[in-house]
Design a protein with these regions (language model features):
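N-terminal [4Fe-4S]-dependent radical SAM core
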Residues: 1-31, 40-74, 78
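Pocket-edge structural micro-motifs
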Residues: 15, 82-83, 266-268
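Residue-level detector of alpha-helix boundaries and kinks
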Residues: 20-23, 52, 86, 238, ...
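Glycine-rich phosphate-binding P-loop
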Residues: 35
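Short, compositionally biased low-complexity segments
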Residues: 39-44, 224-228
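Conserved AdoMet/S-adenosylmethionine-binding subsite of the radical SAM
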Residues: 62-252
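C-terminal accessory regions of radical SAM enzymes
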Residues: 229-281
Length: 281
């Protein structure tokens, strides 16, 4: 069971290198979805926090109060919500910190982008339709249940996410279905474009094989699909094999996009490296 702890912080608007806002807002520290491939696991601040990732959520109860003050002093034009947490995880239902933040941003006319994988975001459609939500990057995937149970056991089901994305699209809210991560030989994105008829595009990100816990991720995969052990070993060690695989994936996505007459972006990490986080554009 996830432990909730109420905490007070000294600042809520923090600079970000992600080009979706001048500042980032994280209403919580921690995320009970506990995804094994979450980038935040390697965050220096998070790594110093006692407790296993996913077992705790620090609720920043004074975040709305701070935001009211910092908007006046910092005058942000656009902010990002949820770079190191999911703003709509179950803790939000109890504390409604994100709800208060959205109300404040709307009141002051501050635009915002949102990163989430939670269908609970649809509960705030009324706030999101007030004209200041620029875009929601909604993380989706499509792998068999046994694989999901190993890699993101506490996250919302994929079908629930698909329904939430389409609900937001039906309400004319800007949403980017963000298929991430593409798990080699596991993720099924065939006909993915047709699953979101009102979306002009879908974006994709490949699994980052340089994550600090990549061996744990691979172990989880191999426990379900032992036949993939050799292939994942090659992805770690063989640059030519790695690059050829992802080139094939790109071609498959392009073929699907052309068939659906939709736009796309594909982000593939360099061998033993990262891609540049240029989401806006």
């Amino acid at each position: 069971m996830t432990e909730y702890k109420e905490v007070k912080i000294s600042r809520i608007l923090n600079p970000t290198s992600i080009d979706l806002g001048e500042y980032v807002i994280n209403p919580f520290m921690g995320c009970e979805y506990s995804c094994l491939y979450c980038y935040v696991r390697s965050n220096k601040v998070i790594s110093k926090r006692p407790g296993e990732w996913g077992s705790y959520v620090d609720v920043r109860i004074n975040a709305p109060e701070l935001l009211e003050k910092e908007i006046i002093s910092k005058k942000p034009k656009c902010v990002l919500l949820g770079s190191t947490t999911d703003c709509f995880q179950p803790a939000e239902r109890k504390y409604e910190i994100t709800k208060k933040i959205l109300e404040i941003l709307n009141k002051h006319g501050v635009y915002y982008h949102i990163l989430t994988r939670s269908p609970a975001v649809v509960e705030y459609i009324g706030l999101l339709k007030q004209g200041f939500c620029k875009k929601i990057y909604f993380t989706i995937n499509n792998v068999q249940a046994e694989v999901k149970s190993k890699l993101e056991p506490k996250s919302p089901g994929f079908e629930l996410r698909f329904k939430a994305v389409n609900k937001l699209l039906d309400e004319k809210i800007g949403v980017v279905p963000y298929f991430s991560p593409i798990l080699p030989w596991l993720s099924d994105f065939k006909d993915i474009f047709s699953m979101f008829p009102e979306s002009n595009s879908v974006e994709f990100e490949g699994l980052n094989m340089s994550l600090i816990n990549i061996n744990d991720i691979i172990s989880g995969i191999i426990s379900v699909r032992p036949d993939l052990q050799d292939n994942y070993g090659k992805m770690l060690k063989d640059k030519a094999f790695y690059e050829a695989f992802w080139q094939g994936i790109k071609k498959d996505i392009i073929r699907e996009a052309i068939k659906a007459k939709k736009n796309y972006n594909v982000y593939i990490h360099n061998f033993r490296g990262y891609f540049s986080n240029k989401y806006a554009g």
